[in-house]
Amino acid sequence: IDEATQAIEPECLLPFLHGAKQVILVGDHRQLGPVITCRETKAAGLDKSLFERLVCMGIRPVRLQVQYRMHPELTVFPSNTFYEGTLQNGVTISDRQFEGDFPWPNKAKPMFFFNLLGAEEISASGTSFLNRTEAAQVEKIVNALLKSGVKATDLGIITPYKGQRAYIVNYLAKNGQLNPEIYKAIEVASVDGFQGREKEVIIFSAVRSNDKV
């Protein structure tokens, strides 16, 4: 079962109903878990995947410790925060060298945080959030990346909220400085919708913040 850590337990148990004698669970319980919106379901413990429950019971999973996606400098945070510093790099800095002329604050570390004063608001659906100021800044960063040589198909925008996703798509189409057809090639997705995939450059639109880091 692939992406088993995103599935609730009853979903993972379905193969047993068809006579399966062995089941291999593939996933990462340190990443995105099942998306549960019902309080009663969470209270019943169904917000935990079968994979994570088995790990908590003492069953040790086989961990793949070499990553081939990220620039080595980007590995440091997830390795130290989620994997006890055990992640290893299967790629070198030269393998992931950014060739464009984008003005990184530190070219040796191809990432940065952009602090904004805009506040979130409830989306038109009433069930999600959006941040207009943040969406406008995303458009500016997108334009800078495209002008520096990044292909639209190599660029992804991820946000935790469907309201923000819809707003960004609409904002790029109506307010983008470049040809609207270019923006259509940029994938804008929710966190769970993008799980397990990759792009050369990712912009993360957080929408909201709190006092915790």
Language model feature labels by segment:
Residues 1-213:
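Conserved helicase motor core of SF1/SF2 NTP-dependent helicases
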